[in-house]
Amino acid sequence: MGKKPKYDLILFTILMLLLFAPMVQKRTGWVKMEPLKGFYPSTPYPLLSLKDFRTGDYQKQMEQQLSERFGFREPVIRLYNQYLWDFYRKTYAHDIVAGKHNWLYYEQNVNDYYGTEMYRWLPDAQTARVTFNREARLMWKLRGVLQDYGVEFLMFMAPEKGFLYPEHLPDRKHDTTTINAREYYVAQFEENSFPYIEMTSWFQALKEADTLPYSLISQTGAHWGFSSVLAADSLLRYMEALKGESLPQLAIGPFHESADSTQSDDHDLEMNLNLLRNLRHPYDRLYDAEVTVVTDSAVKKPKVLFIGNSYLWRMHYYIPFDELFEQSEFWFYNSIAYSGPGYKDQTPVADLNLIEKVLDADYVVWFTTGNQMYKATYGFVERALMNFCVEDDKVNKTRESLMDSLSLSWKEANQILINDPEHYFSELAGDSIPTARNSKVRETLVINEIKEDSAWMWNLSTCQTVIQNATLKQVLLMEAQNIIEGKPLMRDMTNIEAKRDRVEQLVADMVEEVRGKPVLMQQIEEKAAKNGISVEKQTLYDARWLVNDKIKRGVINLETP
């Protein structure tokens, strides 16, 4: 009996710790927790209102918010996930499927192997055929358009894990009534003589030969590892053959066991399970080596635009792209453009000049996997064809017509055009390569030619000081228009200082002319008030714009007195 109070004290202490330790941890974070992997949406702290309190919405939001932020949340979730995995081989991780022998797959890889992935994107096999035929035809058309400008467009399909290691997939029933996108597109590419590399078949042969010291794709990973270097070399050699160029070689050093950080990326699916302990990987051989780029005076470093999925990131991890390419960009899912050293610069693709970017490349590579071919090129091919072959005004008017007639938003109307551009634009219809061209294409080609001439660019930068308030980009466009319209070139202008003085005198004369027009001055006063500047400064801005506009239109010729 004497020991009972002691036990009571111990139990009471444990109870208090269980009650208050999470509260203290939440407030102070005194124990450092390893963050959970993956994406977890954050619920904002709810604002209390009488309406939400009475309907129960406030309580639901607060409960959700608290469940995402209680102390020691990370180990509690890992403990629960471990319990689910050990006893039921079950996971709540989005899109991750547990295979046999502790293998992990993305859901779409499993679906594609068993023939059901098509239903995620298309209602039936007939619709799939129509869609795939149209996409393959549009790719062929775009390639023909770009070849006119020395740009090669090709397809690269990385290997699918489900088809490479089907023996570890969970048992499911095959659906034989559907169409496999990878196999269908390969047949279309062969028929259309469209250049492509399909890696699944080749990697299946490599797996059977079993001569490589490293795994092609890891047991619990979604993406390939060092095998991506082998694929990159094949891509380079194929690009060489397409244009008859000598491109850099990749040299592979001695193999060694992969570092822990690299192995963590090789097990990215497992990391997203958020278990307490790591799974065993008896099937993995995780080795890599240093990769160097070999060039000489006869080698050309290409300019490449990649558009596609996350499989490129592992290739980028092992290979020094900055040394391999003169320049390269990666348009991730045709949404975010990664560029610059190490692909550290990010820009929304929608903000970029597509014509300029594509014409600045030697090769445009659509980089994907077979299971993602159901979504084709995420609208890249359609948008590129409209940009290259249809005038901007026509595209805008067609979009506006859809918006007005169907009460659609800009985004909805634009998606209709993307879904079937051949239907809305006669320039893209039919089974032949489009011959119509957007006038912006000629402008871009001329500007690219100017940029290649350093002396020309220097002259234009000098002219920029004459045409004040004009950016170099605007001056380049003005010079391109001069070439297209057969006007005198700014490059050939002489006596720059004298011309600058003349422009300033023309601006001063225009200021006096504007001041003598009461109606115009009233408009300037309204603009000055709106812009928050003085009337004098607004008058100067408007006078300079009028002079620059007359110079641009040829009304004022700086070459004549």
Q: Which role fits each region the language model picked out?
A:
Residues 540-541:
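Short, charged, amphipathic alpha-helical segments
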